[in-house]
UniProtKB/Swiss-Prot annotation:
Taxonomy of the source species: Eukaryota, Metazoa, Chordata, Craniata, Vertebrata
A cellular component annotation (GO) from this entry: nucleus
Tissue: Testis.
Subcellular localization(s) per the UniProt record: Nucleus; Chromosome
Family membership: Belongs to the protamine P1 family.
GO function terms (MF aspect): DNA binding
Gene Ontology BP annotations: chromosome condensation; sperm DNA condensation
Main function: Protamines substitute for histones in the chromatin of sperm during the haploid phase of spermatogenesis. They compact sperm DNA into a highly condensed, stable and inactive complex.
Region (Disordered): 1-62
Protein name (Swiss-Prot/TrEMBL): Sperm protamine P1
Gene: PRM1
Keywords: Chromosome, Developmental protein, Differentiation, DNA condensation, DNA-binding, Nucleosome core, Nucleus, Spermatogenesis
Length: 62
């Protein structure tokens, strides 16, 4: 029984590590995209709403 418990623990640990690594990568990517969006928003304008709609769709996909 102890052996099984130990195995499950190590498995969960590896899973957490993988998830954490992926999350940090995604966060950095999101930050850069957000910066670019700020600039594009100024040029095109908020009244159009097309870029905003596209961004929300992209965000959901990511």
């Amino acid at each position: 029984m102890a052996r099984y418990r130990r195995h499950s623990r190590s498995r969960s640990r590896s899973r957490y590590r993988r998830r954490r690594r992926r999350r940090s990568r995604h966060h950095n990517r999101r930050r850069t995209y957000r910066r670019s969006r700020r600039h594009s928003r100024r040029r095109r304008g908020r009244r159009r709403g097309y870029s905003r709609r596209r961004y929300s769709r992209r965000r959901r996909r990511y």
